[in-house]
Amino acid sequence: MRVSAAKAADRLLSVEGVQAAFALCRIDDTVHISARSQGTINVQLILEKLGGGGHFDSAGAQVKNSSTSTALTTLRSAIDEYLAENL
């Protein structure tokens, strides 16, 4: 399932105009987040705010004991914070 999230994030980057993609997948009580970037947005910095890590254009995080909607809200906040600080 986590591999599917990574593939989904990769696939979303092929959509015209998409600079970064985030895919979420819940397994048991953990939400797995896979992120990819075209190189203009540092997804590593965004997912570090959720306890994850990786590389500038490819990163991941696991949010334990969370619903998908709660993890998504937290992710949106991290993205908004990143954009306010960096763009």
Where are the model-predicted features located?
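Gly/His-enriched, cation/cofactor- and phosphate-binding structural elements
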Residues: 1-87
